C-alpha cells in the first residue's frame, strides 16, 4: 500500500446535498477526503478519536484498525496524510478503542492479551516519512477490553469490558508524566 503520501482523490470530495455527501449521511458536513482501508493495509476500522497538538496546532485522527492504530494528519482536511501505524499489541481484532489524555493516546482492544497501549503523540511532530511506531508503554494487568474512558479532572482512565472483574471497571491512575510504570487499581466493591 502507499504510505506517507497525501491521499486525495477529487472524486471523494462531495458536498452535503439533501442530507447526503455521496453515499454518506452528512448532517450539513461536506465530505472533503477519504482514505481507503487498502491504504492502511487493514481489513477493517471501527473507531476514531482526535488530537490537536497544543504546540503546533496541527490536528490528527487516531483510527482504530483491526491490526493496530493509524495516525493521520488532517491539518489540511482536503489533503490528509497517513503518517504511520502502531501495530496491535497481540492479535487482530475488529474492535479497538482510543482515547487521549494530554499528549498521549490510550488504546485498548478486544484482542486477547492486548492490554493497554500508551503512545506519546508528540512523536508525530517529527514524522517525515511513513513510520511503524512502537508503544511508549504497555499495561498488561488485563488482556482484552471493550472500551476506555478518561476523566481528565481526576487523571484516571476507566477500562470497561475487560477480562478482569467480570467485565467491570478497571481504574488506572494516568497522572504520571511517564507511563512506563502504570498499574491498574483493584475495583472497590
Each model region followed by its residue ranges:
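Feature marking well-ordered beta-strand scaffolds used for ligand recognition
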Residues: 1-183, 189
Amino acid at each position: 500500500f502507499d504510505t506517507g503520501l497525501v491521499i486525495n482523490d477529487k472524486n471523494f470530495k462531495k458536498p452535503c446535498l439533501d442530507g447526503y455527501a455521496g453515499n454518506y449521511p452528512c448532517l450539513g458536513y461536506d465530505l472533503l477526503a477519504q482514505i481507503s482501508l487498502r491504504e492502511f493495509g487493514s481489513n477493517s476500522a471501527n473507531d476514531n478519536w482526535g488530537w490537536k497538538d497544543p504546540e503546533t496546532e496541527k490536528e490528527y485522527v487516531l483510527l482504530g484498525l483491526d491490526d493496530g492504530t493509524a495516525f493521520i494528519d488532517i491539518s489540511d482536511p482536503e489533503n490528509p496524510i497517513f503518517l504511520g501505524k502502531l501495530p496491535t499489541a497481540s492479535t487482530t481484532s475488529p474492535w479497538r478503542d482510543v482515547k487521549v489524555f494530554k499528549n498521549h493516546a490510550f488504546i485498548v482492544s478486544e484482542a486477547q492479551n492486548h492490554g493497554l497501549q500508551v503512545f506519546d503523540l508528540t512523536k508525530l511532530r517529527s514524522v517525515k516519512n511513513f513510520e511503524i511506531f512502537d508503544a511508549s508503554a504497555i499495561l498488561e494487568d488485563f488482556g482484552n477490553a471493550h472500551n476506555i474512558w478518561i476523566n481528565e479532572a481526576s487523571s484516571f482512565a476507566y477500562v470497561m469490558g475487560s477480562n478482569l472483574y467480570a467485565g467491570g471497571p478497571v481504574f488506572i491512575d494516568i497522572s504520571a508524566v511517564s507511563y512506563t510504570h502504570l498499574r491498574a487499581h483493584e475495583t472497590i466493591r
